Amino acid sequence: MTRIGIFFGGKDNGGTAKVAKKIQELLGKDMATIHNVEKSGTDDVNKYEFLILGTAAWGIGEMHSDWENFIEELIEADLASKKIALFGLGDQVTYPESFVDGLGTLFCRLPFKQNVVGFTSVDSYKYYYSTAEKDGRFVGLAIDNDNQSELTESRIINWVEQVRKEFKL
């Protein structure tokens, strides 16, 4: 059984799914399994020791609609002993006042925030405001494929290595 569940909201061929697949590739398919939250439930979450949760911005910085439905399942899951890492996609140029706010909303809705790892630097981004920023850091990996696609792969690689250490794998 794999130890890490990667859960994403959105289309199976969308940007969030592509990031989830890259994360899985870096961790190894023997370590991580991908789930679309649209097709997942509490039992899927409960079978993993570690969780990686990903969302795209939806509307103006909102959490993807699939997450709105799944968040209740997640809240009912046994999260007390699980380490959790988050990632989110956004557009800092078109929506600088709500950059990766879906990521921030996901973090805010989670119980056991103390179990969240994988915080990242806000340096190299240009935005006005983000609910995903806490104490000068993002609550997870922030991806802007619209304006900084050339940085996406290295950001994912560095973040996965950080999360691997914080998960103690």
Regions found by a protein language model. Give the residues of each.
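Residue-level recognition of beta-strand->loop/alpha-helix junctions
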Residues: 7-8, 36, 88
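A short beta-strand-loop structural module common to alpha/beta enzyme folds
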Residues: 30-41
